[in-house]
C-alpha cells in the first residue's frame, strides 16, 4: 500500500469539489467508524467554558430608540447603514424602537450609532 505525505493528501483534497469532499468524509466516517463532528463539539465546549472570563463584548445590536425631529435624515442614514430600500427603511424608522443592525462588530456598531445620532436619532448599543 502506498504511503502519502500530508502535503500530497492536502494537494489532492484541494483539487476536490465540496461535494466530493463531503462524500469522502462520509465514506471515511463509515469505514473507520468515527464521527468528524465529535472533536469540534469538544473544542466548542472548551471555548464555551472560557467565554465567561471575557467581559468585553465583540458583537452589538444597534437599537434605534427614537427618531427625533429629522425623520428624513434618519431614514437616509438607515438606508446607508443597512442597504434597505426606501419603504423598508421608513417602516423600520416608524417602528422605533427597533434594531437597525444585529450582531455587528464593535467598530461597525459604533460607526452606525454615530451616523444615526448625527442624523438626529437616539440610539442604544446592546
Curated annotation (Swiss-Prot):
GO terms for cellular component: cytosolic large ribosomal subunit. It comes from Bifidobacterium longum subsp. infantis (strain ATCC 15697 / DSM 20088 / JCM 1222 / NCTC 11817 / S12). The keyword Ribonucleoprotein applies. CDD domains: Ribosomal_L7_L12. Homodimer. Part of the ribosomal stalk of the 50S ribosomal subunit. Forms a multimeric L10(L12)X complex, where L10 forms an elongated spine to which 2 to 4 L12 dimers bind in a sequential fashion. Binds GTP-bound translation factors. Gene3D superfamilies: 3.30.1390.10, Single helix bin. Pfam families: Ribosomal_L12, Ribosomal_L12_N. GO terms for biological process: translation. Belongs to the bacterial ribosomal protein bL12 family. This is Large ribosomal subunit protein bL12.
Amino acid at each position: 500500500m502506498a504511503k502519502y505525505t500530508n502535503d500530497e493528501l492536502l494537494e489532492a483534497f484541494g483539487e476536490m469539489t465540496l461535494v466530493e469532499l463531503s462524500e469522502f468524509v462520509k465514506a471515511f466516517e463509515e469505514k473507520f467508524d468515527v464521527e468528524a463532528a465529535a472533536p469540534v463539539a469538544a473544542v466548542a465546549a472548551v471555548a464555551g467554558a472560557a467565554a465567561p472570563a471575557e467581559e468585553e463584548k465583540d458583537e452589538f445590536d444597534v437599537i434605534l430608540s427614537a427618531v427625533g425631529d429629522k425623520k428624513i435624515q434618519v431614514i437616509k442614514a438607515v438606508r446607508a447603514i443597512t442597504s434597505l430600500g426606501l419603504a423598508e427603511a421608513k417602516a423600520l424608522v416608524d417602528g422605533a424602537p427597533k434594531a437597525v443592525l444585529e450582531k455587528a462588530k464593535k467598530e461597525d456598531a459604533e460607526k452606525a450609532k454615530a451616523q444615526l445620532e448625527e442624523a438626529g436619532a437616539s440610539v442604544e448599543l446592546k
